[in-house]
């Protein structure tokens, strides 16, 4: 991709600078930190823009607050509406309370109680939360109907020039804080609001900086739209990287990204999980899946960034501790260390012992075993999870299984079966 190095008509540097004046006394000027571990690993200078330390633990406050700050007195009196199950809802709720504007926040009925409570906390006394529908489309429809019926203003999570300009204030801070020339900037793309603002500012103030968009491989709405030359809607997505998993990128954000993005990278969800765990264990950074996307993409650019100055936007840190086990599981599977099998065991004494003694390697560990004895049958299936110490142990494990009279199916290699059982 070759971006057009000029301002587009939708969002310009002057809009971002105005937004910076509007939000600077409300949002936290988050730190830009050189990360020694990552810098050593990739033989370059890696800087993390820590939006996980923002007051609502994500960049979303910037765009929501700036948008609401632009409202007329009539719009302020009528109130606002948003549809979100995550960080945008928190940003709108905080802005409602700070600006004294009443807001109605529509969230899916399936939203975890913890997220609902966080939104309530940020907007206490100034918001009503309406839980409705099972999907974002249901929620969006209800929010739109409320806007029309009550003459409220809809605060879009990304496809709005004021929101995009607000998110771009993050780039103002980056260039003010960095003590050298940034050669690369990596940031996540979901709806596209963040990188539309950040990319616009960088391409006009630091035009030699390469702007790299990063998407989850299971929700590549921008990548597919870029390939098609127009916005497309994905049939299905993997919702794991929830802060960046959208079926359709914004129309306005797509137009803007096409003028500022140098490359688009797709990162498998399992790799994202590995990066989340490494950031936590090695750097004491609590990143949500979308927040870890930028760091997770570095392996794909390790040759290009060697010896360079690289900024990674850690876009948020609203991570549910209850998801950590799933993240560890996805990471192990991606790294080739966790494997699942359906093994058809002979229903005779000693069959399991034979499997343990003659199939498992000395460093292999059974992490899951589900077996129900079948009466009047000579064999019975069991779901077996095996964690390897080294990826290279997989081949010998399969060789040993093939030598024994155990018929088996590798669950990892059957996506439908995997999602059904695991």
From Swiss-Prot:
Keywords: Amino-acid biosynthesis, Branched-chain amino acid biosynthesis, Isoleucine biosynthesis, Lyase, Pyridoxal phosphate. Transmembrane segments: none annotated. This is L-threonine dehydratase biosynthetic IlvA. The lineage of its organism: Bacteria, Bacillati, Bacillota, Bacilli, Bacillales. The modification N6-(pyridoxal phosphate)lysine is found at residue 60. Catalyzes the anaerobic formation of alpha-ketobutyrate and ammonia from threonine in a two-step reaction. The first step involved a dehydration of threonine and a production of enamine intermediates (aminocrotonate), which tautomerizes to its imine form (iminobutyrate). Both intermediates are unstable and short-lived. The second step is the nonenzymatic hydrolysis of the enamine/imine intermediates to form 2-ketobutyrate and free ammonia. In the low water environment of the cell, the second step is accelerated by RidA. Pathway: Amino-acid biosynthesis; L-isoleucine biosynthesis; 2-oxobutanoate from L-threonine: step 1/1. It comes from Bacillus subtilis (strain 168). InterPro entries: IlvA, Ser/Thr_Dehydratase, Ser/Thr_deHydtase_PyrdxlP-BS, TD_ACT-like, TrpB-like_PALP, TrpB-like_PALP_sf. Homotetramer. Pfam families: PALP, Thr_dehydrat_C. Its cofactor is pyridoxal 5'-phosphate. Pyridoxal 5'-phosphate binds at residues 87, 190-194, 315. Its EC number is 4.3.1.19.
